[in-house]
């Protein structure tokens, strides 16, 4: 309903219009306001899932639950360059109204990219089909995926060839804790399977444990043990009051604690609240009734019996009581030292008695008729020496980091002469001779080429020369054909063969 003021304005407006028309009767003019009520439609109704079956700890409903798939991020062996000209062909007619100079420039750029790709393909085909191709020659992965010239070199970097970045949905699909593991799986890593080319071993990674909240660097980690729940020291005996020894220490509201450090040191209190995010505890002190906030690792959980006995005992805080406690600690240390000294003295007397007894037995044994037979001596059980595998003309790897300050570490050399079963003379690739090289400083090498010769250094066929026919890198084995047994094939471990660079009968 219109207000009286608006009604008066409307009447005055009608009078003015009638006067301007010379007293003529004018058509009535009316004003109105329209208001529409828009009802917001409710969202999509929630779909309900009904329980159908229970198998052990698994619940089955009407909607099938998708099992989580193994997350694997595949390794990119070859870059896929982003071609903008292909996307431009799919654009609508509105985008074709661009300036002619811009369209011409885009066409020139796409043509340049096409020519660069064709030229690189020609070089690659020429290298593959060339007369002198080394099968062991490998191009690094970064060089294979190198960006064509003219795009990301110089002062101005053009990233038009790069693909579009990942979306937020892609990031949400891959959890942070599973990202590194997914990349390793894409590179071929498998759980409980060793990695490497020659000696595969399943090495357990070092998992760093998260430091508890509120415990900064340099803090005493042993304080965490005091917060562990109490465990009965011995089973209860008949007649013991049940529940005294079995009282569990809980870090929660109502728990009894003693402050170990800070302004309220040695005071007792009860926990009123716990802030796990910041690692702090709200404690109400027994003396004074003050509520304070203390770091979690500065308190010690105590039993109800200890709390009732010492919580309001003010004599504990006096200087005389502290001096008495220190004196008790000193007496306990003295008693421990005396016990240790007494044990040492008793041990000395026992050893002297045993020595005299052994001397008497030795004299009696010498005077007896069986003194010619020596008494059975207890030999120290030392580990058996490693089997010798050194042979002349073997190509080996030096693995001793301490020799000559690590100068020859991880370098390859040739065995020139074998002095003893475990020492030899080696020649480096530069021609330098190294004397008195021990076997434990060296490691066998398996040749990469099948055309190279190998020698069996351990086992039944030690000293035989042959060639590798097939390799099993997963099990670190090789199928070998020896020159002496041309019609037979042997399967040998990598540890029993070594690269041989000496002369052969062929």
From Swiss-Prot:
Gene3D superfamilies: 2.30.30.140, 2.30.30.30. It comes from the Eukaryota. Keywords: Coiled coil, mRNA processing, mRNA splicing, Nucleus, Repeat, RNA-binding. One of its GO terms (biological process) is mRNA splicing, via spliceosome. InterPro entries: G_patch_dom (IPR000467), GPKOW_KOW1 (IPR041993), GPKOW_KOW2 (IPR041994), KOW (IPR005824), Rib_uL2_dom2 (IPR014722), Spp2-like (IPR045166), Spp2/MOS2_G-patch (IPR026822), Translation_prot_SH3-like_sf (IPR008991). SUPFAM superfamilies: Translation proteins SH3-like domain (SSF50104). Component of the minor spliceosome, which splices U12-type introns. This is G-patch domain and KOW motifs-containing protein. It comes from Danio rerio. The gene is gpkow.
